[in-house]
Each structure stands twice: as structure tokens, then as C-alpha cells.
Amino acid sequence: EEKSMKKNDIFELEITDMGTDGEGIGHYDGMTFFVKDALIGDVITARATKLKKNYGYARVEEIKTPSTFRVEPQCELHKRCGGCQIQALSYEKQLEFKNNKVRNNLMRIGGFSEAELDSKMQPPVGADNPYRYRNKAQFPVGYDRDGNIVTGFYASRSHNIIPVEDCRLGVPQNKEILDIIKEWMNECGITPYDENTHKGLVRHVLIRYGFTSKQIMVCLVINGDSLEAKRRAGNAADILCESCLLYT
């Protein structure tokens, strides 16, 4: 039987579940729809963007009735950045989502029965504060459209850099360090690595913070096999840290 639904059709959809990547799942006209940025419990106006035989994809046109699990996100970039797809979901519901994801994978891939998991699998232990807890972060370096040096994170399923000044999951010191590195690169004519041309020096900045020691390790991941290139990267140590190890 041919479906009446066509691409760009607009329809009301209740989100009743969430997929493994945090997308909302709803059912309409005998089809299952996957909707980015929709949360379980939302009632939305959706626009069909891609249709298959029994399922399709849609985007949110309007949230008609917000889910009771929907909260105000801490980061305005959560929809674009590839790391916080479910930040608009309450933390308690995030834990439930992650628990179900692990549980379903153990049954589907590991072959465990529901009874086995009921007896052996413990619920996840949540953090007292789900922000500012990550002691390690790696930031790709590149250019924005105006030719300015930027650091940030990759957009979902791409290597396009979303400029991030201060990720709420990492420590506040990251922003200051990244600002110093960008200033150093601009002043010294140091270029970011370009994945298309394979030219440029600085690929990533890795920062690790010791919550106990209060020490910070900064690693510049560079595209340079010559000692001179590495020395140019090592010059940043005068600004960034007390000591520097230069590997040749």
C-alpha cells in the first residue's frame, strides 16, 4: 500500500521514545519517524525530510507541548556541537536514557536476557554536579569563514569546527589557555592545520587538569616532522606553563 506521506509534509507528532543518538522517535501514519532535537514527551509540529518504506526522518517546526523532562540547556551550542545532544533533557532522564542504551546493547549484542540484567546490572550513579567535571579536553584548531583562528569541537558527523569559548563540561581554565594559544598563534604567524591542503602546523590542543594537584598539562598536537616546527610550537611554553617537554 502506497503511503500518503510526502517529503515536506507537516504533521503533528508525539515523541514516545529516544534513539541511540538522542533523537526523538514518534509514530505517524503507520511509519516510525526519527527527529533530531526532539525529546521523549514532546508533542511537536514536524516536517518530513526523508522517507523510506516504513520509516522516515523529520525536523522540528514547532514544539507545541514541551516534555515535562525538558530543561533549559546550559550551552547555547548544544544543538550544533556534536557532544551534548541531550542537554535539554533533565539529568535524571539522561541517566535513564543511558541506562537503557547500555541495557539494550547488552541484550542485542551481548546476548544477555532481561532476567540476567535484572539480577546483575546496577543503575548508573549520577554526579552531584553534571557540569565542570571533565579533567581532559581536546580542541581541534582551524579557521572560521572570516579567516580567524578558532578552537572548539566538531559538529555532529563532520569535521566542521563549531567555535566554543567555554565548554560547560570542562574546567573554566580551558578558555583562558585557548585564548592564550590563539593569541600566540596570531602574533607568531602560526597557522592551524588544514585537513584539505594538509598544510599548517597546529592540529589540536589537548588540556588535562589535575583536580587534586591543581596542575595543568597542555599538549599541542602539530603537523610537523622537523625540529624547527616543533621548536616553534614549544615557544608557547614561555606563556603557558612552568616547564615544557619537546619531543623530537
Which role does the model predict for each range below?
Residues 2-246:
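Accessory RNA-recognition modules of RNA-modification enzymes
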